[in-house]
């Protein structure tokens, strides 16, 4: 049976959510941060030491996008991916790649800059903040064109890949989404999905919903206080 290792309050939420959307059988293993980063149990499974990690027979795999692709095609009969024949195929592959190729790294860079003690008025910090603002406008504009989901009328894995950065990741770096009305409407639609609700119940029941404009409370500061 497929086993999914989820570190609470992390991007591995994508994999739990995906499995719930696909309604497939899987074994969920939950891990807590120790206190801020991956626990030894994750490092013992996967030498990179990051979540998610999935196991399927002799296979052990990390990387969100790889895990999503593997599960969709090995266990989900291709559901939540669009085939090349679909008219919105290009949108699907674009937003799927944009999520971890551009959007999430932009937030990660700003997290690193802040952790290094660089003031937000620093030219480099301002330049990277400007990049993130541009990317958020890009997502907001894309949602304005498609009106429902990133790849059009169908919910896809591109949405699953993107939502983490627009929600949970905001607890590690403050992002105010008040100016992005299409994103906010989109997030309200996301949390109505039974699959998303089921993921939260099983994987992160204590995590607040982060679908409003103002930046949520900083979870990283809570973790630091416990370190």
For each of these PLM feature ranges, what is it?
Residues 72, 165-166, 199-200:
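Active-site-flanking alpha-helical
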Residues 68, 170, 197:
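Nucleotide phosphate-binding site architecture
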Residues 27-29, 178, 198-199:
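A local structural micro-motif
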Residues 83-84, 198-207:
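Short, flexible loop/turn segments with low-complexity composition
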Residues 203-227:
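Acidic/histidine-enriched, glycine/proline-rich intrinsically disordered or flexible terminal extensions
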Residues 1-126, 226:
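GST-like domain detector, emphasizing the conserved glutathione-binding G-site
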Residues 44, 192, 201:
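Phosphate-coordinating loops and pocket residues in cytosolic domains that bind phosphorylated ligands
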Residues 96-194:
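GST-like fold's C-terminal all-alpha helical module
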């Amino acid at each position: 049976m497929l086993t999914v290792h989820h570190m609470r309050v992390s991007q591995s939420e994508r994999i739990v959510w995906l499995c719930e959307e696909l309604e497939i059988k899987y074994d969920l293993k939950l891990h807590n941060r120790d206190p801020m980063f991956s626990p030894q149990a994750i490092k013992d499974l996967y030498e990179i030491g990051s979540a998610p990690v999935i196991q399927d027979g002799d296979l052990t795999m990390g990387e969100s996008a790889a895990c999503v692709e593997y599960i969709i095609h090995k266990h989900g009969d291709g559901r939540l991916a669009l085939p090349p024949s679909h008219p919105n195929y290009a949108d699907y592959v674009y937003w799927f790649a944009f999520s971890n190729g551009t959007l999430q790294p932009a937030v990660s860079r700003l997290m690193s800059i802040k952790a290094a003690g660089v003031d937000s008025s620093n030219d480099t910090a301002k330049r990277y903040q400007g990049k993130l603002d541009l990317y958020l406008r890009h997502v907001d504009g894309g949602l304005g064109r498609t009106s429902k989901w990133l790849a059009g009328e169908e919910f896809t894995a591109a949405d699953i890949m993107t939502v983490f950065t627009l929600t949970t990741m905001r607890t590690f770096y403050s992002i105010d989404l008040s100016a992005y009305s299409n994103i906010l409407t989109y997030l309200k639609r996301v949390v109505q999905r039974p699959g998303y609700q089921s993921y939260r119940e099983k994987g992160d029941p204590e995590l607040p919903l982060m679908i409003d404009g103002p930046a949520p409370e900083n979870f990283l500061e809570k973790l630091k206080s416990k370190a």
